[in-house]
Amino acid sequence: MANIPKKTSLQKSSLSQVSRTREPFLKMIHAKESSPIYQTWTQREFLLPKETKEFPGFTLQDYHKLALKQPPCTELKSKVRHQVLYPSKDAAEHTWGFHTWLDVGRLPATFPTRPDVPYDSNVWRHLTHANAHRLPAAQPGIPPPSWMGPHSFLSFISASPIVVDLKRRKQIIVRTVKELKEVEKLKLRSELRAPPLDANGNILPPPNFKKYQYISTGGRLVPWGLQFLPNPIPNNICKSWPCPNHQPHYQEKVLKLARLPTVPLSKDLVKDYQALIKDRLALPVHYLSKARPAKTPEGKRKRRPGYV
């Protein structure tokens, strides 16, 4: 038999050192192996595959997939999610100058009395800018407006024989008349939302005008309405500031089609506008619609029995 070399005392001490260093690691390994892994009763009793497989004869039909399909993401859901993720970031507030821009747009347009004079685009700066007369004129100049009046495209097609084919000409006339009727409808809706104003800032009411009840922000009807305060004209420094008016004067998107009262114009704005149109011609923003109110019967006839 071969002689087995005996371990010296130096080798034994080195082995004992290695075993001492491995002890904490071995304890950690044994502790992890011994700790039971939490499993549900279904996982312990049944073998659940990681990926679901569809067997032939049991494939999901279209109406089954509807139950698994997530509902569509609407605008309201996206707003709620955005508010949850970023609660500090609210919607941007409208600025002070935004109201001035809206109020100026409600006033009638001003044109020079002589049509051959080019239109100066700085005319609206006189309402909000103190030193507007020192500003240079816009380059290039805006040409004067054209007033067509009754000479519209419909009268041009009807009078001039530009279209030889009678059938084609009739189609163009019918389509143009249909577009003009649609324009009248849109004009009537615009008058309900923002009625035209005169040079004094007063509303030009149509015949048989009826004042509507005020609808509050919460959707409640107020009999006398809320007296809105006019927005003062800001200077050049305050144009970009948030609106100082804390009343619920700016309608929400939900009530954009509701008949809300408009904010009255500022007295300073009307005064500057009247001084501006001394040598100019003021025309309404859009011509008043020719739509007439529906005729109401004077008295309803009593129906006799058997009368249809």
UniProtKB/Swiss-Prot annotation:
InterPro entries: DUF4532. Expressed in Testis. This is Testis-expressed protein 52. The gene is Tex52.
